[in-house]
Amino acid sequence: MDFNAYSSEVLEWLEGVRKNRGTDAEKTLMLCKNIRDYAREQDDEKLLGYAYYYSGETYYLLNDVDKLFRNLSCSLPYLEHSRQHGLLARAYNILAITSMNRGNAPFAMDYYLNARMYCEKYKLYDIGIIININIGMLYNNFGEYRQAEKYLEQAYDLLQKNKEIPEYYSYLLNIYIGLGNSCFYQEEYMQAQEYALRAKRGVQWTSGRVRADCLCLL
């Protein structure tokens, strides 16, 4: 999304959010408030979507569920109207993760499927890999192991077409773990062992520096 047409002050706020997200929650929220206040004055949906999304993401990291839902829910129409589809898919992903953590699996699946729809429609392959992995993990939790395999294999296919992404081996490891679990719980022990060996090699490829739970991937 191109923000170059904005004033230097707004660009400074936007850059501040990018630099501080995930490391300085207080500063990120302050900058998002600046952006949001300005965007309301200007009736600017692009900036409103951006500010609400990154506020919601920050509250996710702070484990403030009410503010997370409030901000991300506000972000959805603005992100849709301003065509910020990458952030829109990520917003649905966070809503799904949080719903699952609260024990509301049906809502989680609805959010994931919305995210997946945007990824397919707008060719958001990197986010699409994450979403398919997360859906596969959710189906494993349901005990629907064939469905889990279906989505994990789709994640694998997408990943093989996008080998240049920095998270390649991290995603591959999560896929192998998910497929291994699917096979194990179906008593397909030889296949489960093969995925376990692949996962072990994956840890070696990444020297152990792996984000090993895709439900935390944003």
Residue ranges of model-derived segments:
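Residue signature of alpha-solenoid helical repeat architecture, marking inter-repeat boundaries
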Residues: 7-8, 46, 86, 126, ...
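Amphipathic alpha-helical segments of tetratricopeptide repeats
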Residues: 33-40, 73-83, 113-123, 153-164, ...
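Residue register of alpha-helical TPR repeats
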Residues: 11, 50, 90, 130, ...
